[in-house]
């Protein structure tokens, strides 16, 4: 079987992490099929095949673009594939052969994002209509849609009532092995980014549903009510959303207390970006990990922190309850007072903190990219045979 993988996202934020890990582990579990891995110019050199059956194909077409539906489509057709795997929803809509997708969430369907957009409202609404049309077509055209949680599967079944449950396959994500490596340059990293005190950490994008505003408000309560003297460190990609958050932090007079760091993405024009190794160092030195999102599909970053002994406090939402069970402290993401109280409990109670560190290590063991790859490979085989 000849399989194509759309890896143009390779290594970039959430979808890129997923793509990177699924490819690396498919290389380990599949020694018989041949793969064409489509990459952009920015990440072409980042991927180095470790399985002779995996070959790289340059497909320098921007995602969510017109070229994705024209030039990229031609590139894929030239490979004469038996199956095309897209670890997202943005398929070439005119691709005529079998497709398997992996779609991480349905946030644009289940959470109103108008408030958070940086675009003119009329333009945003046009993009939203186009997004939903392509999304629906991707589900329709997919032999199977791989989803990362039961929560996301339930949302698919609710919004696409014309499709049977058999359309979807559950495959939990895992912890990137690169994020469990030990690093020894903690002091150097802290000094580089101006982290002069103890700190609370959060890693992820700054879209409206991530509720980063709520995190900053929580920090203000923690500082004023509980006398917290540490810093809040937010690591995100550099984009319009993080730039807007930086302005809000400055407006509140918190620029010395709330630090915004940008992690590395290929299109970043910044000279100062946080590398993967530095994120490991930050996680190993932080006091507590906090995520206040209103919506998530799997929420991997807290798990990555727990893998190196960082206890987590998370928003009490369905996805988090499913993935993390009793291994984290939960709070109402709409209640900044409660958020601060729960975070402070971990900060001041070493025994409680140690309890959740141990629970975290145990919970991490449940998730493995090798399992994800094996499930995905079985989906490929089923699609090819039917």
Regions found by a protein language model. Name each.
Residues 1-386:
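Carbohydrate transferase catalytic cores enriched for Leloir-type hexosyltransferases
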């Amino acid at each position: 079987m000849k399989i194509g993988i759309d890896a143009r996202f390779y290594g970039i934020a959430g979808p890129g992490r997923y793509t990177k890990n699924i490819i690396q582990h498919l290389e380990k579990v599949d020694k018989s099929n041949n793969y064409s891995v489509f990459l952009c110019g920015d990440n072409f050199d980042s991927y180095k095949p470790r399985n002779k059956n995996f070959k790289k194909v340059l497909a320098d077409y921007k995602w969510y673009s017109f070229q994705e539906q024209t030039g990229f489509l031609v590139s894929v057709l030239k490979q004469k594939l038996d199956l095309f795997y897209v670890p997202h929803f943005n398929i070439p809509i005119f691709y005529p052969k079998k497709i398997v997708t992996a779609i991480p969430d349905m946030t644009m369907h289940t959470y109103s994002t108008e408030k958070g957009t940086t675009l003119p409202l009329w333009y945003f609404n046009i993009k939203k209509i186009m997004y939903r049309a392509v999304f629906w077509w991707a589900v329709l055209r997919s032999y199977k849609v791989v989803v990362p949680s039961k929560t996301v599967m339930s949302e698919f079944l609710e919004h696409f009532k014309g499709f049977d449950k058999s359309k979807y396959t559950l495959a939990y994500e895992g912890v990137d092995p690169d994020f469990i490596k030990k690093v020894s340059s903690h002091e150097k990293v802290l000094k580089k980014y101006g982290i002069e005190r103890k700190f609370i950490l959060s890693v992820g994008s700054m879209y409206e549903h991530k509720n980063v505003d709520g995190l900053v408000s929580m920090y203000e309560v923690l500082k004023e009510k509980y006398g917290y003297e540490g810093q809040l460190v937010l690591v995100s990609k550099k984009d319009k959303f993080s730039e807007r958050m930086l302005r809000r932090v400055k407006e509140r007079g918190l620029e010395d207390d709330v630090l915004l760091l940008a992690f590395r993405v290929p299109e970043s024009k910044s000279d100062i970006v946080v590398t993967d190794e530095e994120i490991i160092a930050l996680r190993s030195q932080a006091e507590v990990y906090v995520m206040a999102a209103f919506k998530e599909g799997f929420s991997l970053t807290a798990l990555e922190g727990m893998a190196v002994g960082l206890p987590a406090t998370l928003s009490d939402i369905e996805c988090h309850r499913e993935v993390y069970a009793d291994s984290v402290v939960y709070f109402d993401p709409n209640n900044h007072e409660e958020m601060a109280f729960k975070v402070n409990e971990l900060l001041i109670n070493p025994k409680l903190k140690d309890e959740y560190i141990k629970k975290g290590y145990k919970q991490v063991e449940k998730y493995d990219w090798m399992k994800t790859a094996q499930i995905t490979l079985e989906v490929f085989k089923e699609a090819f045979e039917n």
